[in-house]
């Protein structure tokens, strides 16, 4: 496991075991634990063990590990807590709501009570689908 690239990453501290967490799953490159500030029962975070600031900067190996572990956790949550559905959420950048700058995937169970994750759509002047398609498809990435 590569060393934390920031001096004060709480998720790196959890990976290293210097901060206690409610770990509910793990594989070679990822770990899953209950969110300390849950928005619903069973709200879980799945993170790569190797520090990466966000989704876009996370290596493929770690992304695959996070994805596979997220699926295992989702099945555990469905079997044990019986939610009506699940939200999978990752915020990238402060403006998008990212608070901890170590890539993490939220798995938020949804129950009939309506509690849990939700979002509001902001109405803006949007480019047409055709304009967005042209911009994105011409990118070399």
Curated annotation (Swiss-Prot):
Signal peptide: none annotated. InterPro entries: HINT (IPR039384), Histidine_triad_CS (IPR019808), Histidine_triad_HIT (IPR001310), HIT-like (IPR011146), HIT-like_sf (IPR036265). GO terms for biological process: nucleotide metabolic process. Residues 10-117 form the HIT domain. This is Uncharacterized HIT-like protein MG132. GO terms for molecular function: catalytic activity. It comes from Mycoplasma genitalium (strain ATCC 33530 / DSM 19775 / NCTC 10195 / G37). A motif (Histidine triad motif) lies at residues 102-106. Pfam families: HIT.
């Amino acid at each position: 496991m590569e060393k934390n690239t920031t001096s004060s990453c709480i998720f790196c501290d959890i990976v290293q075991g210097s901060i206690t967490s409610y770990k509910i799953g793990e594989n070679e490159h990822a770990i899953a634990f209950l969110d300390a500030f849950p928005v619903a029962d069973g709200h879980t975070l799945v993170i790569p063990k190797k520090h990466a600031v966000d989704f876009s900067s996370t290596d493929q190996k770690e992304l695959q590990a996070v994805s596979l572990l997220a699926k295992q956790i989702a099945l555990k949550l469905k079997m044990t807590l019986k939610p009506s559905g699940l939200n999978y959420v990752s915020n990238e950048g402060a403006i998008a709501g990212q608070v901890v700058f170590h890539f993490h995937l939220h798995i938020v169970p949804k129950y009939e009570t309506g509690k849990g994750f939700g979002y509001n759509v902001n109405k803006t002047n949007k480019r047409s689908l055709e304009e967005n398609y042209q911009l994105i498809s011409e990118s070399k990435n």
